[in-house]
Amino acid sequence: MPVPTPLSEGTTPDTAAQELRTNRLWEALPGLSYGGDYIPNSGRNRSARKIYRSCRKPECRPSALASSPGLGLEPVEGSYDFTWLDEVMDNLAATGIKVALATATAAPPAGWLRKHPEILPVTAEGSTLGPARAHYLVVGMVLFCRPVCGEDDPRLGERYKDHPALALWHVDNELGCHVSEFYGPRRHRRFPSMAEPTLRHDRGPQRGLGTAFWSQRYSCFEEILTPRPAPTTLNPTQQLDFQRFSSWGLIDFYSMLARGHFARSHPRCPPRQIWWPQAPPCLWDYFDWAKKLECHRQWSLPGGRRYRCVTSELAFRRRSDSEAIAGGKPWSPDGALSPCRPCNWLASQHDSRTPGEMARNSLVHVGRGIWMLSCFSSGDRASRVRRNSTRPWCRTPEPTREYGVKLLSWAQAQSLVRGSRRRGGITHRNRLRLRTLVGKRTGLHPAPMWKYLELLRAFHAPCSCPASPPIWSIPALTLTAMTWWSSRPCTPSPMPRPAILRQRQNAEPQCSSATSVDIDENDAVRLGGYPGAFRDLLGVNVEEFHPLPENSTVSLDAGWSGRIWSEHVHLTGAEAKVSFTEAPLTGVPAVTRHAVGTGAAWYLATFPDATGLESLLDSLIAESGVRAPAMAAAGVELSRRSHADGRSYLFAINHNVTEAAVSAQGTELISGTPFNGTVPAGAVAVIAEG
């Protein structure tokens, strides 16, 4: 490799490189890692030199991760040029920066499109789409990914496996972000082969796909086609299987790269992947992905005026929620993209940051368990989609420098918190799986206002600051002293009713919403009456659904109002806590409670307004015994991380425009002084308690 380009007198290669070889590389990274997506135009250009010099300032953490994608490594098919990447990698190593090196598969060389047009995506209608900057190809095309980094020609892995800057392999980039469904002749042929073992386990395609109703009786598996536009309603189970097929295709592609030559060439350098927010068009099955990932990087952007406070964002986008997805086991460090300024493609829904918001939101993520912070874009580029993205080292450095100072101050105390986990709190047991979005895509919702992500935000918002931030979890996770929410509209549940009842006999209070368990894992209706699998547990029976017209509400005797949905509920052991006061459901229970074992199961026959959700949450918290990490003023988000030996650290994030009181004692780690009981406006306090 070429000698690193001299930056200035006194620059030396990274002397800690050999120490990183003794363990998993990210485990040796000191404290909090801070970096961003670095896409240089050239390793020698003026902007690159400015980046390197800026990174050496104390405001920027020397051990930060930088993503260096491999675009341009194959300018002509079969001809490789690593010169610029060698120079960039060497310069980053000389600066002390660790790199998450991309696998160069996010975009193919332009010449490949002429020879291999099959890598272009095909829509359900049969139209072939054209090329774009990246993420436009059909993943899984072995012929494309192997020439640079596959098993047959492992140039990238072999070349950089021992490079002192390497810390992570960044496998592809944002898989499934723009192309998550796979059509075309090859996919039509592969879909039946995927469906066969699944449907054989379910006693054949006739029962598995409900063909008696859908007039699709098959004589062989080869007759099963991928769902395409049709003049009438499509089979929802077949659509669900196709979504599984597409998600598994992404997983197979990732595994081929991550578990292939990269793992063999450097077993101590783990792979990672960026997760896109759980919203269409991305339909990943995150729980299947969790089995494959050792560390991941998750998009986390501020939600605009509707979700001004970061606490109203989906908790799933934070690190502790990834721990829950992993089944409660500790995960390896991951990187969350720190909220950026509004980009030209997000301006309609995202606001610019307020003073201190970047540091505040970043440490919110740290409080939830992450160890790596990444900014969305670093480095100036004249040609780019995101023309107004924020960079850690921008031309107006004061706010960013302040951010870097805060992170550096926190990183110096990071070793104290490292290894701790967030415990307790309220658990949202929503299976954020791809099938939860199928109903929305198929148009088979019982009410058009069931907007999955909007409902999750509504359930999440009131339980962020009052007590302990929520954790999203999976059905297999055992709960103790936690409140369980099920706000899944029409979400299939794989758990049979007897198993649910046995598992919950001694549980703490739980709460299920309307239509949460009415269908099974194959999107088929559970027979025997509603609310499906939870009917006996909840002590209610639903006679009839009463969907509400759009933008209308129904009055409740507690002073709340219900929206979207209502049901004619009969009590079969439960007691009515709130009832409807409007015809045709006057006097019919709207919120019920059923004592089960030492706990209780609550049921919502309508979707309460914000006041109702807060009141209901207060009741559930009081009944469950969940306690806030500390007493604090409204608008202060609290999270506690603890070690097994009892040491604990309280994160207090003040989202207010005025200072707020927090009842806690200990040393404030960022300032290094005793905590005085108040958190300044828009600031964060990290308190070593005791």
UniProtKB/Swiss-Prot annotation:
<comment type="similarity">
    <text>Belongs to the glycosyl hydrolase 42 family.</text>
</comment>
<dbReference type="InterPro" id="IPR013738">
    <property type="entry name" value="Beta_galactosidase_Trimer"/>
</dbReference>
<feature type="active site" description="Proton donor">
    <location>
        <position position="174"/>
    </location>
</feature>
<dbReference type="GO" id="GO:0009341">
    <property type="term" value="C:beta-galactosidase complex"/>
</dbReference>
<dbReference type="GO" id="GO:0006012">
    <property type="term" value="P:galactose metabolic process"/>
</dbReference>
<dbReference type="InterPro" id="IPR013739">
    <property type="entry name" value="Beta_galactosidase_C"/>
</dbReference>
<comment type="function">
    <text>Highly specific towards beta-D-galactoside substrates. Hydrolyzes 5-bromo-4-chloro-3-indolyl-beta-D-galactopyranoside (X-Gal) and o-nitrophenyl-beta-D-galactopyranoside (ONPG). Has activity against p-nitrophenyl(pNP)-beta-D-galactoside, but not significantly at all towards pNP-alpha-D-galactoside, pNP-beta-D-glucoside, pNP-beta-D-mannoside, pNP-beta-L-fucoside, pNP-beta-D-xyloside, pNP-beta-L-arabinoside, pNP-beta-D-galuronide, pNP-beta-D-glucuronide, pNP-beta-D-lactoside or pNP-beta-D-cellobioside.</text>
</comment>
<protein>
    <recommendedName>
        <fullName>Beta-galactosidase</fullName>
        <ecNumber>3.2.1.23</ecNumber>
    </recommendedName>
</protein>
<dbReference type="Pfam" id="PF08532">
    <property type="entry name" value="Glyco_hydro_42M"/>
</dbReference>
<dbReference type="GO" id="GO:0004565">
    <property type="term" value="F:beta-galactosidase activity"/>
</dbReference>
<feature type="binding site">
    <location>
        <position position="173"/>
    </location>
    <ligand>
        <name>substrate</name>
    </ligand>
</feature>
<keyword id="KW-0326">Glycosidase</keyword>
<dbReference type="InterPro" id="IPR017853">
    <property type="entry name" value="Glycoside_hydrolase_SF"/>
</dbReference>
<dbReference type="InterPro" id="IPR003476">
    <property type="entry name" value="Glyco_hydro_42"/>
</dbReference>
<dbReference type="InterPro" id="IPR013529">
    <property type="entry name" value="Glyco_hydro_42_N"/>
</dbReference>
<feature type="binding site">
    <location>
        <position position="345"/>
    </location>
    <ligand>
        <name>substrate</name>
    </ligand>
</feature>
<dbReference type="Pfam" id="PF08533">
    <property type="entry name" value="Glyco_hydro_42C"/>
</dbReference>
<dbReference type="InterPro" id="IPR013780">
    <property type="entry name" value="Glyco_hydro_b"/>
</dbReference>
<dbReference type="InterPro" id="IPR029062">
    <property type="entry name" value="Class_I_gatase-like"/>
</dbReference>
<keyword id="KW-0378">Hydrolase</keyword>
<dbReference type="Pfam" id="PF02449">
    <property type="entry name" value="Glyco_hydro_42"/>
</dbReference>
